[in-house]
């Protein structure tokens, strides 16, 4: 497999980065920069902020978000495995079973530790 086959992928990545970065750079360069106290103050639905604009969230929100990302990533790994199951054979099957076992053991550990309880 030669590197010429990766050229379209490389160009796709470059165009994607360019589409994301170019408007931000152009806005920064061409946009007016006129700061004043009204623009720099926190704003909530037409009222001045009632409390601290940077309130702390409970750690459980972050834990649930990390668990969601972990198991969402697991599904992202399982889709290509399911498509190529005929081609990868028994070794591929059992390696994914080990992967799933590790994830299930981790999930049971978190459940037993009470990480998923909202008391």
UniProtKB/Swiss-Prot annotation:
- Give the family this protein belongs to, as stated in its UniProt record: Belongs to the complex I subunit 3 family.
Q: Which residues cross the membrane?
A: 9-29, 63-83, 88-108
Q: Does the keyword Magnesium apply?
A: no
Q: A Gene Ontology MF term for this entry? A: NADH:ubiquinone reductase (non-electrogenic) activity
Its recorded reaction(s) are:
a quinone + NADH + 5 H(+)(in) = a quinol + NAD(+) + 4 H(+)(out)
Matching entries from HAMAP family are given as: NDH1_NuoA
Judging by the UniProt lineage, the source's domain of life is Bacteria
Species source reads Albidiferax ferrireducens (strain ATCC BAA-621 / DSM 15236 / T118) (Rhodoferax ferrireducens)
Disulfide-bonded cysteine pairs: these are none
| Membrane topology reported for the UniProt record | Multi-pass membrane protein
Function according to Swiss-Prot or TrEMBL: NDH-1 shuttles electrons from NADH, via FMN and iron-sulfur (Fe-S) centers, to quinones in the respiratory chain. The immediate electron acceptor for the enzyme in this species is believed to be ubiquinone. Couples the redox reaction to proton translocation (for every two electrons transferred, four hydrogen ions are translocated across the cytoplasmic membrane), and thus conserves the redox energy in a proton gradient.
* Name of this protein: NADH-quinone oxidoreductase subunit A
Q: Which gene encodes it?
A: nuoA
Where's it found, cell-wise?
A: Cell inner membrane
Q: What is its EC number?
A: 7.1.1.-
A GO-annotated cellular component? NADH dehydrogenase complex
Q: Which UniProt keywords apply?
A: Cell inner membrane, Cell membrane, Membrane, NAD, Quinone, Translocase, Transmembrane, Transmembrane helix, Transport, Ubiquinone
Q: How does it assemble?
A: NDH-1 is composed of 14 different subunits. Subunits NuoA, H, J, K, L, M, N constitute the membrane sector of the complex.
């Amino acid at each position: 497999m030669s590197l010429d086959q990766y050229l379209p992928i490389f160009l796709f990545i470059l165009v994607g980065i360019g589409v994301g970065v170019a408007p931000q750079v152009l806005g920064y360069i061409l946009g007016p920069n006129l700061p004043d106290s009204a623009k720099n103050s926190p704003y909530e639905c037409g009222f001045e902020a009632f409390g601290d604009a940077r309130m702390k969230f409970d750690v459980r929100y972050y834990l649930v978000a990390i668990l969601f990302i972990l198991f969402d990533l697991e599904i992202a790994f399982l889709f290509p495995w399911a498509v190529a199951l005929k081609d990868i054979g028994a070794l591929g099957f059992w390696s994914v079973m080990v992967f799933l076992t590790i994830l299930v053991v981790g999930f049971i550990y978190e459940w037993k530790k009470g990480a998923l309880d909202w008391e």
